[in-house]
Amino acid sequence: MDNLTQYIDWFRHSSSYINAHRKKVFVVLLTGETLAHDNFSRIVHDISLLHSLGVKLVLVHGARPQINDALTSAGHELRYHKGLRITDSEGLQLIKQTVGAMSIDIEAQFSMGLANSPMHGADIKVSRGNFITARPLGIIDGVDYALTGVVRKVNAEAILQHLDKNSIVLLSNLGYSPTGEVFNLSAEDIATEVAIAMQASKLILFVPQCGVSNNNGELMSTLSPVAAEALLREIPADNIQSKNGTLVSLAAAVKASNKTVHRCHLISFADNGALIQELFTRDGQGTLVSKDNFEWLRQATINDVGGILELIAPLEEAGILVHRSRELLEAEIDYFKVIEMEGMIIACAAIYPLDEECGEIACIAIHKHYQESGRGDHLLRALEKEALKQGLKKVIVLTTQTAHWFLERGFQPIGINDLPPKKQQMYNYQRNSKAFVKLLR
């Protein structure tokens, strides 16, 4: 498949996401590290694309490294307690100058419209205002945070009025009090509280890495708030605040998910197109934190045998699947992948290597309450990825009742004599299954 064909195929399949995202409110956190990265101009283009597709966008920008540079250049001491900046009046003046200049620069980027740029014809309007009411953080452990503040109230109604006028709303890390004071806030705190107040469909947080990884360095593509909280509990609070922007954002995602925000996404600000990949492809790019119908696809273990047997039993009785005993399933469990939802196995499938080049996909089963939901495609992609990882060049499948499903996913019919010799010897002529093959790329 050439690049043009791949692009056309992806664009067609993105229509369901375009329709799902239209008129929804997304809150996007742009940390100071995000703004400083070379990829930020492309992030602006991708955000502009979302706007053109009808997404209502609230952008919250931080300025932590830029503020540090400004304070250091002025010879001002950087003071922190528990990872949070202590802001005095002199420092606040420098912070206001720095943040104000950054907000203007962001507006300028969204105002671009040169004929040879992706922004041509966008005509984006950016609105700013005193939408965030703040209060002082106060004294903690005997330490006075002075003009460091926290969100007291979000004027969600006023923000929505600007969104309804087709504007992008831009917020900084500054908040304002009814007495006319200005406070230095955490951008993560503002983004979280705005997303909650707006009942946003998504909170999108740009982080240094591709989301959250486990101890083996493997991406955790989905997390429930409970699982995310468990990860955060293993890390001292000071480290969460001061040493890892991903962990700060993960804590924000947990808070938002436990309130009114359906989905929180942690994606890399360094990867070109990460925002588009996360929102318009099934596999995404980073980590999704959500408590809605939480499920995850993983390698099966011996503890899953009972759940798999319960899942496949009705299909075996109907003659759709070949019968597997508990002993056989225990012996072959390493070939299986499962989708687990809240402790229940709702789908499974297996990939059996037949020779050095070919594997067999088998035992695809999905719980009757969760069919017609794309989980079969999710499993199939995972098995194909596993086959490629094992160095296989093609996969086969034998089926009695789902031939068209496999044809629609790139499989081609073959004769029994075209099967690998090992599979020919095991072929059950009584079942009379049809055989299909798919070349892997």
Task: Locate predicted features.
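C-terminal "cap" of GNAT-fold acetyltransferases
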Residues: 419-441
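A conserved beta-strand-loop-helix scaffold within acyl/acetyltransferase catalytic domains
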Residues: 323-367
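Conserved acetyl-CoA-binding loop-helix of GNAT-fold acetyltransferases
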Residues: 372-389, 397
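Polyanion-binding loop/helix "lid" in catalytic or ligand-binding cores
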Residues: 88-118, 156-157, 163, 170-194, ...
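N-terminal glycine-/serine-/threonine-rich phosphate-binding loop
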Residues: 1-58
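Short amphipathic alpha-helix that is part of the acyltransferase structural core
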Residues: 292-322, 432-435
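A short, internal acetyl-CoA/4′-phosphopantetheine-binding micro-motif in the GNAT/acyltransferase core
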Residues: 364-372, 401
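Ligand-binding beta-strand-loop-alpha-helix segment within the catalytic cores
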Residues: 72-170
